Amino acid sequence: MKTRGTFGEVQLGALLDQMLSPEQYEANVKTKKNATEFVEFAIKLPGKENNNDTVYLPVDAKFPKDVYEQYQDAYEAGDAALIETSSRQLEITIKKMAKDIHDKYVDPPFTTDFAIMFLPFENIYAEVIRRTALVEMLQKDWKIVVTGPTT
């Protein structure tokens, strides 16, 4: 599991490095007061009160590889019941990941009131965003925006 997480983190870091200057983001940031968790990356935004204050936008890479592979295998097998089961499991996993990001890293006014979940493979990202109700629920309930390598 750590290898998967590391891969997504490396890919996300490379993308941020291409798009932002080093002053515009930080790696391994503690975004919640009195917390022990560190978000992989946080984009630095100016604070309301003072330009020296920083508000962080948490960005966390997630890679639901096993669940997504089960979903793909079900489609390849053409098993309708297995497709339905693995589809539900994929949604459950994405929801848990979104809740995890929100609970660990979102803490206004020190952070934005939302965070970004980065999915490191375009096929996983495409599968998630085609589920409009899921994306809307993630945004409404957990204030999580899903992104992928090309977004």
List each model region and its residues.
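Amphipathic, heptad-repeat alpha-helical coiled-coil/stalk segments that mediate oligomerization
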Residues: 1-151
